[in-house]
Amino acid sequence: MSSAAADCPIAFNPKPRIERVDLISGQACLVIDDALLEPERLVAFAAAQQARFRAGVFNAYYPGILLPATADTTAALQAFFSEHVRRRFHARRVLHMHSRLAITTQPAAELRPYQWICHSDNVDLPAEHSMQASVLYLFHNPDLGGTGFYEPRRPRGEIRQLYHDAGELSPADFSTRYGIEPGYQCASNEYFRRVGGVDAKWNRLIFYDGSMPHSAEIPTTAKLDADPRRGRLTLNGFFTSRRPLA
């Protein structure tokens, strides 16, 4: 592989059309179609690097395999966020950012209970900081699933206990206690109400507030594949920003 191919520089659409999808009061998801000028280059890079994807590293909770994005890719994504997105989330400036290529691979039967329920990305952030997140869909088959957004239906203490038990109980015990079955969350349940979602589409990029509970919506896992050319490949970004001054 040439050095240029290994670095896999990406170029974002310089004139993006940004659609706002309202979710709940004060929360929205931004959707940008045709986000990259040559998205197939990133897929080819992921395929060439397939052996370097790993499970259980970078994020032990992720139901698949991950590969850190290159410095050039991360810089390009951060530049796009800073120019086109940051102010829409009232973020003053980016303090830290990282990105990675991700392939969802785990079938429902192999998921742990904490993977059966939606989650937030901004755990343990100081009050003066916020986190925004992004997902770039790099697959053509919409059946591999988009992203759904949720709000809690129960008091904070009950939700905290739910997450605690999801990490401690066996799948059978968790399902018995909470009435939640194995699988990726795709609809409301007794603990979370679905408030909206975005369908997957080739070269579609979404941004959302990381505090918003969300989940990959994968109704059937039969087509999940570890091959970047066939599987649910995404580029995921996480942006820790300083909140505006009061």
Language-model-detected regions and their locations in the chain:
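Short acidic, Pro/Gly- and aromatic-enriched capping/linker segments at domain boundaries
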Residues: S2-S25, F192-G196
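Long, compositionally biased, intrinsically disordered segments
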Residues: S2-A5, P39, L245
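Short, functional N-terminal and low-complexity linear motifs
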Residues: D7-P14, L42-Q50, P171-D173, P182-Y184
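Short non-domain terminal segments
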Residues: I10, R87, N236-G237
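Non-heme Fe(II)/2-oxoglutarate
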Residues: R17-Q115, G146-F149, R153, I159-E168
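Catalytic core of non-heme Fe(II) oxygenases with the double-stranded beta-helix
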Residues: A108-P213, E217-A246
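Short hydrophobic/aromatic-rich motifs at helix boundaries and adjacent loops
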Residues: N13-K15, F53, A76, T176, ...
